[in-house]
Amino acid sequence: MSPGSKRHISGVLLLDKASGLSSNQALQTAKRIFSAHKAGHTGTLDPMATGLLPICFGEATKFSSALLGADKTYEAVLRLGYMSTTGDAEGEISIAAGMESQYVDLTREKIEAVRKSFIGVITQVPPMYSAIKHRGKPMYTFARAGVEIERQPRAITIHDLSIEAYQGNEMRIRVTCGSGTYIRTLAEDLGHALGCGGAYLTALRRSALGGFDLPQAYTLTGLEAMPPSQRDSCLLPADSLLRSLPPVVVDSAAALSLLQGRAIPGTHPAGESLLPGRQVRLYDKAQRFLGLGEISTEGYISPKRLIRFEQSL
């Protein structure tokens, strides 16, 4: 391959992002390492944060949104009794209001009661430093200009919250949550609930996302050091993004119809009921992944996003 040329590769790279890199910087570096023609990620991680960042190449980018609503697991370190303008170590730090002493002393009973109160469906006010849009602009643009925007509380789901360690002002937590959860805000809210006036994140690591976890991930440094001929073996197939959906196998005639944009009569996968609006993974008889389909009210399977093949079926 000549220098500077791009490859039309497809697949999913599970990246272990380093701290200090924005998600886009990590994406562009991975794209360069693989000489990929097209790439995209499945949702951002803050620059300070480390951990799992799935990156899609080629045809896999069509399904990158599949993980936006997936559950996530984080490991975080909180500094209790202090606040940050950004909710993390990158902002301006100050002693939390009402904290005459910088010393925090909590009982196990207090910690356990607060921990339990945060599990389930709770409300959370999104932070100013977020990508949520206000009048067409990300909220963080207003925050950087010193403008405070009123935000409405949102319902989020905390599936599990464990206190891994606690000593002095430092608390380590592990949280599994639904989409839309801001761990920076969770840290602040935990600090308030514990009677510490607040808290901020000193470290954040995403360890799992939508069925993927860190042991499967690669670092940019490791990929750079790897022989180019071995890098493609690090990629997962595009359909790994959709493995929570039921598979439907179709014959060659139906596969051709789907690829031509036509709906086909629904076929029930084993043990599955195809209700209207249900999305499915589509395969041909050779178990080749065709793409994503959706069940219509008439029971037909309509093509939603399909893989482009260089050769005909």
UniProtKB/Swiss-Prot annotation:
Record GO terms (molecular function): RNA binding; tRNA pseudouridine(55) synthase activity
Organism lineage string: Bacteria, Pseudomonadati, Pseudomonadota, Betaproteobacteria, Nitrosomonadales
Catalyzed reactions per annotation: uridine(55) in tRNA = pseudouridine(55) in tRNA
UniProt keyword annotation of ATP-binding present: no
InterPro entries for the chain: PsdUridine_synth_cat_dom_sf (IPR020103), PsdUridine_synth_N (IPR002501), PUA-like_sf (IPR015947), PUA_sf (IPR036974), tRNA_psdUridine_synth_TruB (IPR014780), tRNA_sdUridine_synth_fam1_C (IPR015240), TruB_C (IPR032819)
GO BP field: mRNA pseudouridine synthesis; tRNA pseudouridine synthesis
EC number assigned by the record: 5.4.99.25
Entry annotation: catalytic residues: 46 (nucleophile)
Superkingdom: Bacteria
CDD domains reported in the protein's UniProt record: PseudoU_synth_EcTruB (cd02573), PUA_TruB_bacterial (cd21152)
Entry's family note: Belongs to the pseudouridine synthase TruB family. Type 1 subfamily.
Described purpose of this protein according to its UniProt entry: Responsible for synthesis of pseudouridine from uracil-55 in the psi GC loop of transfer RNAs.
Keyword tRNA processing: yes
Organism of derivation: Nitrosospira multiformis (strain ATCC 25196 / NCIMB 11849 / C 71)
Alphabetical UniProt keywords: Isomerase, tRNA processing
Protein name, as recorded: tRNA pseudouridine synthase B
